[in-house]
Amino acid sequence: GAVMGHQAVLASNTSSIPITRLAQSSPDPQRFIGVHFFNPVPVMGLIEIIRGLATTDATVDVVRQYGEALGKQLVFANDAPGFIVNRVLMPMINEACFALGEGVATMRDIDTACQLGLNHPMGPLTLADFIGLDTCLEITNVLFQSTGDPKFRPAPLLQKYVEAGWFGRKTKRGFYDYSGDVPQPTR
């Protein structure tokens, strides 16, 4: 091609949008692939590789070699909404939002219970603030709209926070207020 060499791979770092859908906008869907890095990229050791329906073995091999050269652990996901990590993670974050909204426990207790009880580095509400509540809502919406499964219905509290412009750390307000030295719960 005029802009993209005939051997070039076109990759998307999308965290949830189906690769086959994105590949339809590319000049050559055979060279289109999902290469999902996790934030912060220098710290996180995983790359999720997602093959679209038309993606060739040669394209997968180029991306596999690239990921290995970066020293990352690779996992291969089928082209399904949310792939592996966000298909599992976003329902957990969303359920934490439902639990908070329904008064099951306080923010801190939900985070502490999941952090210590599940041996996670942080609780789901803290993680949502780190990812960005707008991003969490967007991914949850992709899961819900793509599958039609009510288990992916976004929590009203998550929607409310995003509508209020509370996106988490990037706006200094989400489930926690980050304006001071120590984050404080906003509820």
Where are these regions (language model features)?
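A short glycine-rich, Lys/Arg-flanked "PGG" loop and its adjoining helix->strand segment in the class I
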Residues: 1
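Helix-to-beta-strand junctions that scaffold the AdoMet/dcAdoMet cofactor pocket
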Residues: 4-5
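Rossmann-fold dinucleotide-binding core
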Residues: 9-78, 83-87
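Alpha-helix N-cap/N′ positions at the starts of helices
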Residues: 42, 88-92, 120
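NAD(P)-dependent Rossmann-like dehydrogenase/reductase catalytic/cofactor-binding core
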Residues: 58-61, 68-79, 98-102, 107-187
